[in-house]
C-alpha cells in the first residue's frame, strides 16, 4: 500500500532551515535575501503536480461512491418491487396485468388464465387481508376486480375471482389455458361429438352456454351441462350462476374462452340492474384430481335425496320409439309385450313413446290407435309390466288444449308479454309451457296425475326441455336472467314420479332423483353420436353430478339416413352396444334382439342375466351411497389412480364404483383390444389374476359374445 508522500519524505535526514539567526550571523546572506524580494508583477509560481500514485486512489473513490449510490437505488427499487409483488400475490396465485397463474404446493403451475377484454392497471391494485382488488384497467377505465383467497381445508386452496365492468355494453372475456399435452380437462357439457378428456377442434366464438338439442341441430352444447371443469392437475373451476355465460374455444392455443355479455344473447340482466356484465368464478386447487373433484361436488352441487326404483337398475327398459316410431298403436304395444316374454326376457318396464295422443299437447290416448287403452293397461299389468308414457313441454296449435293454455296464460310469451310465443320443434309448431308459472306447473302435473290414476301409469319419460326450443326473445311469468333455469323448472316436473321417470335435460338438477337420459344416438360406430361417444358422454355427465344415467337405446335410433346397416343397426354394432349398456346404470332396448337371429337373442339374454346377477347389486349399493357422498356410480380409471398419467387419457374403459373395471370392444371387426389395469390386484372374468400392475394388456382376446371386465381382487 502506498504511503503518504509527507510520511515518505520523513525517512530522509532533515536539513536545517536558515532561520533569522543565520541571517544575523551572515551579512552576505541577508543582502542576498533582500535582493530576491523584488519579483516581476506577472510572475506565477509553478503549480505543484499531484503525485502519479494519487490518481488511482481518486478514481477508486469516485467509482466506489457511484457503486454505493447504485446499490442504494437498486435496493430501493427492489424493495418497492418486492412490496408490489407481495401485494399482487394471493397465496399461490400470481397476478399480472394480463392475467394470473396458480401453482400447487410443489410449486408446479396448474392453472393459467389471460384477461382478453382488457388488462389491469397494477398501480390501482391493493390488498386488504385475503382480498386483492383493482379499480382501473390499463386504459384508465373504471372496473370492479377482486381475487379473494379461501382455504376451506388443509389440502384445498380456492380463489374467488370477479371482473365487473362499470359501464354497460362491453363484454368481459378471459381465456383459460388447458396447458400442455400432459394436462387433461373434463366436464362442461354433453356434446354432439364427445371426447374424454376434452378435445378442442378449430375455433369457436363464444356462444350462450345454455341447454340445447345437439341431435336435431348443430348447437354447440347439449341438454345436460354445468359451468364446471376439472383438470388432471388437480385444479377445478366453477363459473358463478349470476354470470351471463358464453363459452368458446381456440384449439391453436388450447384455451377455453369464458365470456360474459348482455348483447346478442338470451341472457337478461336482473331486474333493476344495468347491463354491465360480470365474469366471476371460483378456482380451487387440491392434492389430486379425485380429491379436488369430491370437494367441488360437495361444495357446489346438490345431491339426489332419493334413489330410483330397484327394478330400474336391474331390468331393461323396452321402448316403442325406434321399433315403431309414430306408428305405434294398441296392437303393436301388446304384440311387443308378448314378444318380450316369448323370448324369455323379464316383464319389466315398457315405455309407450311418440305418438299415442290425437295431437301433441293432448293428455289422453288417440281412440283410433288405442280403442281400449284401459284394457291394454290391464293386460300389461297382468303380464307383469310397468308402463311409462312419453310427455313433452309443447302444446301444438291444433291440440284441444291450446285454447285453454292461451286463455289461462300458461305459455311462454313473446317479449311484450301479450301473446304466446310459437316455436317450431321436431313435431310441428306450438306453444311452450311456462314452468316458471305456478298455474302452468299445476296444470301440467295435474294432467299427469290423472293419467296415472286412470291407467295406473308407472311414470313418465320427460322429453325435450332444452332452451334451444324457446324463441330467441321471450318473456316468462318469473323473469329468467339465465334461460337454462327454464330447463331446471321442467325437470322438477318429474319429482312426483321419480322412481321410474327419465328426463333428458339437466342444469343444476342433481337433486332430481330420477334417470337422466343421454340425447338420442345414431346407429354408427364413431364419436359423433355413435357407440364410441357413449363412454365419454356417461363419464362427462357423471362428473357433472348426475349419477343415474340412461344411455338411450341399444344400437341407437335406427333412423334410416343416420344408420350404418340399413333399417336396423349393424348386427355387430348392436351386439357390442348391448354389451356396454349391460354395465350402465340403466339399460334400454327398442330394436329388439329377435330382429336379428337366435345368436343375438342368446347374447342379449346372457347379458341381461349378467346384469341382474353381477352389475345390478353393485349399482344399487353405490346408488344408496350417492345420497350421502355425491360420488359418481360410473367412474373414470383415474378415480382410483389420480396420479397415473395413462389413466387420465383412457376413454374406452370405465369403473363401476372402485371394484369393477369394464373394457368393451368398440371397433368393428375386432375380437381383441388393449386393456389398461391400474395399480392393484385384478381378476378377469376368465379367472386370470393380474397382480403386477399397472400393466397394459395388448391384444387381449374378447369374443363377440363377451365383454372384458375385471374385479378388484385385493
Curated annotation (Swiss-Prot):
InterPro entries recorded: Alpha-glycosidase_related, Glyco_hydro_31_C, Glyco_hydro_31_TIM, Glyco_hydro_b, Glycoside_hydrolase_SF
Membrane topology: Single-pass type II membrane protein
Cytoplasmic side: 1-56
Record annotation: effect of changing residue 476 to N: In IBGC7; uncertain significance
Glycosylation sites recorded in the entry for this protein: 240, 250, 511
Keyword Nucleus appears in the UniProt entry: yes
GO molecular function list: hydrolase activity, hydrolyzing O-glycosyl compounds
Entry keyword annotation includes Membrane: yes
EC number: 3.2.1.-
CDD domains: GH31_NET37
Effect of residue 434 to H: In IBGC7; uncertain significance
Cross-referenced Gene3D superfamilies: Glycosidases, Golgi alpha-mannosidase II
GO CC, any one term: endoplasmic reticulum membrane
Record note on what altering residue 463 to A does: Does not change nuclear membrane localization. Does not rescue the myogenetic defect induced by depletion of endogenous MYORG
Pfam families: Glyco_hydro_31_2nd (PF01055), Glyco_hydro_31_3rd (PF21365)
Residues that span the membrane, as ranges: 57-77
Keywords: Disease variant, Endoplasmic reticulum, Glycoprotein, Glycosidase, Hydrolase, Membrane, Nucleus, Signal-anchor, Transmembrane, Transmembrane helix
Function: Putative glycosidase. Promotes myogenesis by activating AKT signaling through the maturation and secretion of IGF2.
SUBUNIT field: Interacts with IGF2; this interaction is required for IGF2 secretion.
Other noteworthy facts: The requirement of the predicted catalytic residue Asp-463 to support myogenic function strongly suggests that MYORG is an enzymatically active glycosidase in vivo, even if concrete experimental proof for enzymatic activity is still missing.
Protein name (database record): Myogenesis-regulating glycosidase
Originating gene: MYORG
Amino acid at each position: 500500500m502506498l504511503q503518504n508522500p509527507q510520511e515518505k519524505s520523513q525517512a530522509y535526514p532533515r536539513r536545517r532551515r536558515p532561520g533569522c539567526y543565520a541571517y544575523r550571523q551572515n551579512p552576505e546572506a541577508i543582502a542576498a535575501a533582500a535582493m530576491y524580494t523584488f519579483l516581476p508583477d506577472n510572475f506565477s509560481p509553478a503549480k505543484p503536480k499531484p503525485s502519479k500514485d494519487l490518481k488511482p486512489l481518486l478514481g477508486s473513490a469516485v467509482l466506489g461512491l457511484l457503486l454505493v449510490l447504485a446499490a442504494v437505488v437498486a435496493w430501493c427499487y427492489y424493495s418497492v418491487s418486492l412490496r408490489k409483488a407481495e401485494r399482487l400475490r394471493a397465496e399461490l396465485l400470481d397476478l399480472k396485468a394480463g392475467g394470473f397463474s396458480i401453482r400447487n404446493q410443489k410449486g408446479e403451475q396448474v392453472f393459467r388464465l389471460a384477461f382478453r377484454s382488457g388488462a389491469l392497471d397494477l398501480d390501482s391494485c391493493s390488498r386488504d387481508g385475503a382480498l386483492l382488488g383493482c379499480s382501473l384497467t390499463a386504459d384508465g377505465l373504471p372496473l370492479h376486480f377482486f381475487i379473494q383467497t379461501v382455504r376451506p381445508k388443509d389440502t384445498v386452496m380456492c380463489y374467488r375471482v370477479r371482473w365487473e365492468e362499470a359501464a354497460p355494453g362491453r363484454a368481459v372475456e378471459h381465456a383459460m389455458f388447458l396447458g400442455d399435452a400432459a394436462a387433461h380437462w373434463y366436464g362442461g357439457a354433453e356434446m354432439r361429438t364427445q371426447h374424454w378428456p376434452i378435445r378442442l377442434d378449430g375455433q369457436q366464438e363464444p356462444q350462450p352456454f345454455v341447454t340445447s338439442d345437439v341431435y336435431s341441430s348443430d348447437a354447440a352444447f347439449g341438454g345436460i351441462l354445468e359451468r364446471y371443469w376439472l383438470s388432471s392437475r388437480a385444479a377445478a373451476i366453477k363459473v358463478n350462476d349470476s354470470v351471463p355465460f358464453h363459452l368458446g374455444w381456440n384449439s391453436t392455443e388450447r384455451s377455453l374462452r369464458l365470456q360474459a355479455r348482455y348483447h346478442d344473447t338470451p341472457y337478461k340482466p336482473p331486474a333493476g340492474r344495468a347491463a354491465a356484465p360480470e365474469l366471476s368464478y371460483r378456482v380451487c386447487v387440491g392434492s389430486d384430481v379425485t380429491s379436488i373433484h369430491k370437494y367441488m361436488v360437495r361444495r357446489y352441487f346438490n345431491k339426489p335425496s332419493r334413489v330410483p326404483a330397484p327394478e330400474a337398475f336391474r331390468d331393461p327398459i323396452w321402448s316403442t320409439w325406434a321399433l315403431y316410431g309414430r306408428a305405434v298403436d294398441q296392437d303393436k304395444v301388446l304384440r311387443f309385450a308378448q314378444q318380450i316374454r316369448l323370448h324369455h326376457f323379464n316383464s319389466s318396464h315398457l315405455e309407450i313413446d311418440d305418438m299415442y295422443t290425437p295431437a301433441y299437447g293432448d293428455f289422453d290416448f288417440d281412440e283410433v290407435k288405442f280403442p281400449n287403452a284401459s284394457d291394454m293397461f290391464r293386460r300389461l299389468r297382468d303380464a307383469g309390466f310397468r308402463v311409462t308414457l312419453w310427455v313433452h313441454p309443447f302444446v301444438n296449435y291444433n291440440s284441444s288444449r291450446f285454447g285453454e293454455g292461451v286463455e289461462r296464460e300458461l305459455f311462454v310469451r313473446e317479449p311484450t308479454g301479450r301473446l304466446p310465443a310459437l316455436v317450431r320443434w321436431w313435431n310441428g309448431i306450438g306453444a311452450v309451457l311456462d314452468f316458471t308459472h305456478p298455474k302452468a306447473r299445476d296444470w301440467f302435473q295435474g294432467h299427469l296425475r290423472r293419467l296415472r290414476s286412470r291407467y295406473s301409469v308407472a311414470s313418465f319419460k320427460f322429453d325435450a326441455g332444452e332452451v334451444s326450443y324457446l324463441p330467441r326473445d321471450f318473456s316468462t311469468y318469473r323473469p329468467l336472467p339465465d334461460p337454462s333455469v327454464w330447463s331446471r323448472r321442467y325437470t322438477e316436473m318429474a319429482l312426483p314420479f321419480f322412481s321410474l321417470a327419465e328426463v333428458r335435460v339437466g342444469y343444476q338438477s342433481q337433486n332430481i332423483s330420477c334417470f337422466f337420459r343421454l340425447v338420442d344416438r345414431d346407429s354408427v360406430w364413431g364419436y359423433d353420436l355413435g357407440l364410441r361417444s357413449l363412454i365419454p358422454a356417461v363419464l362427462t355427465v357423471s362428473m357433472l353430478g348426475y349419477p343415474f344415467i340412461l344411455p338411450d337405446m341399444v344400437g341407437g335410433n335406427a333412423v334410416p339416413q343416420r344408420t350404418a346397416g340399413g333399417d336396423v343397426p349393424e348386427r355387430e354394432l348392436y351386439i357390442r352396444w348391448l354389451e356396454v349398456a349391460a354395465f350402465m346404470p340403466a339399460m334400454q332396448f327398442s330394436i329388439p334382439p329377435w330382429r336379428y337371429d337366435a345368436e343375438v337373442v342368446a347374447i342379449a339374454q346372457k347379458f341381461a342375466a349378467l346384469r341382474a346377477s353381477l352389475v345390478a347389486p353393485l349399482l344399487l349399493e353405490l346408488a344408496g351411497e350417492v345420497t350421502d357422498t355425491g360420488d359418481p356410480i360410473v367412474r373414470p380409471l383415474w378415480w382410483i389412480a389420480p396420479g397415473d398419467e395413462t389413466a387420465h387419457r383412457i376413454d374406452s374403459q370405465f369403473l363401476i364404483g372402485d371394484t369393477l373395471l369394464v373394457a368393451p370392444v368398440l371397433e368393428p371387426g375386432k375380437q381383441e383390444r388393449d386393456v389398461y389395469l391400474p395399480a392393484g390386484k385384478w381378476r378377469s372374468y376368465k379367472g386370470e389374476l393380474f397382480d403386477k400392475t399397472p400393466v397394459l394388456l395388448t391384444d387381449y382376446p374378447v369374443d363377440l359374445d363377451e365383454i372384458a371386465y375385471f374385479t378388484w381382487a385385493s
